[in-house]
C-alpha cells in the first residue's frame, strides 16, 4: 500500500452506529481500511451487516455484547492476527492486519475502571502492547 486512507472509530456498538449514520460516513469518506473498536458484535452477525468491504476481520469478546475490534479493508492483507502475546482475557481487544510495508492495528485498550479496579491489569496490558508494537516495527 503506497497510499491509503485509514480511518479508526470507536463505534460503541457497530449495529447502533449503523443506525446513526456509520454506513453513510463510510460511503462518503470511502476509506481503504476501517478500524473499529468496541464493536460489541459477534463475528457471525458481523457478516450480515452489509458493510462494503471485501476483507473483514472481526475479533469478538468471549462475553456477548462486550468489547470487540475489527479491521475492514478493500485490499487483502498479507496476514491477520488477533490479540497479542501475554496473559490476557478473551476480550477481543486487538486485530492486526499486515499489508505490504505496513501493519494496521485496531486496538480497544482496557479501562482501569472506577476506583482503579483494573489498574494493575491495564499497566500490564500497556507494557505487553508496547512490546508487541516494537516487534511489529522491527519486521
Identify the function of each model-found stretch.
Residues 1-51, 55, 61-67:
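N-terminal, active-site-proximal structural segment of metallo-dependent hydrolase catalytic domains
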Residues 9-16, 83-84, 121-123:
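Short, flexible loop segments at the rims of nucleotide/cofactor-binding pockets, characterized by
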Amino acid at each position: 500500500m503506497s497510499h491509503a486512507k485509514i480511518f479508526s472509530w470507536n463505534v460503541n456498538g457497530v449495529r447502533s452506529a449503523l443506525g446513526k449514520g456509520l454506513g453513510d460516513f463510510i460511503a462518503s469518506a470511502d476509506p481503504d481500511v476501517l478500524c473499529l473498536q468496541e464493536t460489541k458484535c459477534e463475528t457471525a452477525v458481523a457478516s450480515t451487516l452489509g458493510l462494503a468491504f471485501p476483507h473483514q476481520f472481526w475479533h469478538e469478546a468471549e462475553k456477548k455484547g462486550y468489547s470487540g475490534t475489527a479491521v475492514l479493508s478493500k485490499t487483502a492483507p498479507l496476514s491477520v492476527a488477533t490479540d497479542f502475546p501475554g496473559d490476557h482475557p478473551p476480550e477481543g481487544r486487538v486485530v492486526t492486519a499486515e499489508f505490504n510495508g505496513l501493519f494496521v492495528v485496531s486496538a480497544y485498550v482496557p479501562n482501569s475502571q472506577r476506583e482503579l479496579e483494573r489498574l494493575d491489569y491495564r499497566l500490564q496490558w500497556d507494557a505487553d502492547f508496547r512490546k508487541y508494537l516494537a516487534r511489529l516495527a522491527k519486521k
